[in-house]
Structures are given as structure tokens and as C-alpha cells.
Amino acid sequence: MIDNKHQIPREHGQAGEKLAMNYLAERGLNFVEANVRYKFGEIDLIMKDGKEWIFIEVKYRSKAQYGGALNALSPAQIGRLRRAAEHYIQIHKIDAVCRFDLIAIDASQIHWLPNAF
């Protein structure tokens, strides 16, 4: 039996990540990696702006109900993203300025919050 219930959000998430990547690339950021997963957290996008490394969380909502994508990031999710980024920085021996951005997509609107947390 196929469980499409869990597949639909993943497809939306992947579409949102692709939109976010293109949006940021159009604004001069350089793509490094996507969907970096560790057992304790995931990084949706990693990009660079010059020498600065940017770890990006992408939130996509097809409707703006319940606060929309801008309000969809929990403190627990922020903690998991930070742990994943710290691990990525250590294993890749990155010695540079880093920041955490949020891309929130509600239907067709994209909101970019640099240094979101």
C-alpha cells in the first residue's frame, strides 16, 4: 500500500527548496549543497555570499493559514539546524563567517530573512 499522505509535503518542500535556491542565486548567492542530512538535523540549503557561508531553512506553505511559512519555524527546528550546521562546519573545516537565513514561501510570495536566527 502506498502512503501518499507523507509524499505530498516532501514534494512541496523540494519544490520550495528549488524556488528558494533560484531566488537566492538570482540575488548573487552561490549554491554549495542541498538537503544535507545528519541523524540530529537537516540543512535545506547551503550557499555562499562571497566568503560568507549561509545555512538556509526553507519553509513552504501553499496557504497562509495558521501564520503561514514565516511562523512555521520552531525553536526545536532551529536547534536541529544549528547542530547540523556546526557538524558540517567541523567536518568541512570551514573557518569563515556563517549565518542562518530563512526563506518563507507562502503560495507565490517569497520572503527572505537574512540572519533570521
From Swiss-Prot:
Pfam families the record matches: UPF0102 (PF02021)
HAMAP family in UniProt: UPF0102
The species this protein was found in: Shewanella woodyi (strain ATCC 51908 / MS32)
SUPFAM superfamilies xref list: Restriction endonuclease-like
Protein's name in the database: UPF0102 protein Swoo_0351
InterPro entries: Restrct_endonuc-II-like, tRNA_endonuc-like_dom_sf, UPF0102_YraN-like
GO molecular function: nucleic acid binding
Family per similarity comment: Belongs to the UPF0102 family.
Residue stretches in coiled coil: none
